[in-house]
């Protein structure tokens, strides 16, 4: 298994698909990484040479991925909550942020139904 950005990526898949196993790299970014490194997208990871893997590692290192990206996202949410702005309050209460209705629906964000106590 090839290891890129602290993630074991599958060797029997195409390079583009394997790169999407890294948090913060989607299909578009994976395609651009393959284009800049000159690696064919349909090439399997096990067929790549060590130099090509190093080139991919160098390109991936330019982006914020995995733990750094998760930390950055959590810090942004924490900042919103500390500011006390509308989005921060909605995060704190566990409600939808972007104007969705909550009288009905929004079960995913609100969690399972609470029983009514009499």
Curated annotation (Swiss-Prot):
GO molecular function, one term: rRNA binding
Pfam families: Ribosomal_S13
Keywords noted in UniProt: Ribonucleoprotein, Ribosomal protein, RNA-binding, rRNA-binding, tRNA-binding
InterPro entries linked: Rbsml_uS13_C, Ribosomal_uS13, Ribosomal_uS13-like_H2TH, Ribosomal_uS13_bac-type, Ribosomal_uS13_CS
GO annotation, cellular component aspect: cytosol; small ribosomal subunit
Gene3D superfamilies tied to this protein: 1.10.8.50, 30s ribosomal protein s13, domain 2 (4.10.910.10)
GO process terms (BP): translation
Stretches the record annotates as Disordered: 94-118
Origin: domain of life: Bacteria
Subunit comment: Part of the 30S ribosomal subunit. Forms a loose heterodimer with protein S19. Forms two bridges to the 50S subunit in the 70S ribosome.
Role noted for this protein: Located at the top of the head of the 30S subunit, it contacts several helices of the 16S rRNA. In the 70S ribosome it contacts the 23S rRNA (bridge B1a) and protein L5 of the 50S subunit (bridge B1b), connecting the 2 subunits; these bridges are implicated in subunit movement. Contacts the tRNAs in the A and P-sites.
HAMAP family: Ribosomal_uS13
Cross-referenced PANTHER family: 30S RIBOSOMAL PROTEIN S13/40S RIBOSOMAL PROTEIN S18, SMALL RIBOSOMAL SUBUNIT PROTEIN US13M
Name assigned to this protein: Small ribosomal subunit protein uS13
Species this protein is from: Alcanivorax borkumensis (strain ATCC 700651 / DSM 11573 / NCIMB 13689 / SK2)
